[in-house]
Curated annotation (Swiss-Prot):
NCBIfam families for this protein: Gln_ase
Name this protein carries in UniProt: Glutaminase
Domain of life the protein comes from: Bacteria
GO terms under biological process: glutamate biosynthetic process; glutamine catabolic process
Lineage of producing organism: Bacteria, Bacillati, Cyanobacteriota, Cyanophyceae, Acaryochloridales
Organism in which the protein naturally occurs: Acaryochloris marina (strain MBIC 11017)
Gene designation per UniProt: glsA
Pfam families: Glutaminase
Annotated binding of substrate, by residue: 63, 114, 158, 165, 189, 241, 259
Amino acid sequence: MSELQVLLESFHQTYHQQDAGQLACYIPELCKADPNWFAISIVTTDGQTFQVGNCQQTFTIQSISKVFVYGMALADHGQDALLAKVGVEPTGDPFNSLIRLDEDSKRPDNPMINAGAIATTSLIRGNGPTDRLNRLLEMFRRYVGHEVFIDMPVFMSERDTGHRNRAIAHLMLNFGMIDKNIDEALDLYFQQCSVLVNCHDLAVMAATLAHKGINPITQERAVESGYVKDILSVMYTCGMYDFAGEWAYKVGLPAKSGVSGGIMAVVPNRAGIAVFSPLLDEYGNSIRGRRVLEALSQKLGLHLFDLSMGGCGLQAAMDSN
């Protein structure tokens, strides 16, 4: 057994005993999650997998979807055109903030907050709602390596209770940030958040970004390599919401969280890491996930600015027996 596998099992045992946090019960379907679910998965850019826990337990991708839809919008419109519509500035505000709408620039601050994500989703090209949804599902398929499906009860739950997101969309319509067809954009946004994945899927998706846009399992390209830099930059500065600064300081990896309990992190050129545990902190991030990734970064020297290690601890742990 490799040192990395031993390390993951040790972290799983240690952090599974910690039960702080709350389920995301403002979405009724997410309140049904088992607080004991806990999984850690690492997929390397050469296709190796190291994992422990409930790695096959499915959950909805939620806000982690914003990363991949942003990449799709980049491919549809190009960097300059998309930047004119959605900024890349961190906010320091909660993900569902109503107030971070830049009236001067006529664009939301970044694509990782809900306002920016709704605007980004509204820009996805297609011949009507069904075509746009099919394009999104095909994009997710390339990242994951297999067909993906929407959890319809979660989608309906989000659509029925997503009044705050509707308020955000109407504010953006008022400021001229999105076009008038906001119900269609919101439905597509709720659908993308309701795509089912598991912890291993998330690790493969993160590893695809680490591997310059090529899925390390299927060898299929999911996104052009030129856009990966843009995606990872926004993940690094904005992916963990109002915890993004402390995350960059302590963990030092591009990452994205979702309120269903997933967190994925990218170790460029090396691996994708995913942790799933539905108990959340006050920022909407998985508490166990945050702690595992902090511990992995420190133990293996994964911080992008840890010049003494340069991520070599990960390779050493993989190679040991």
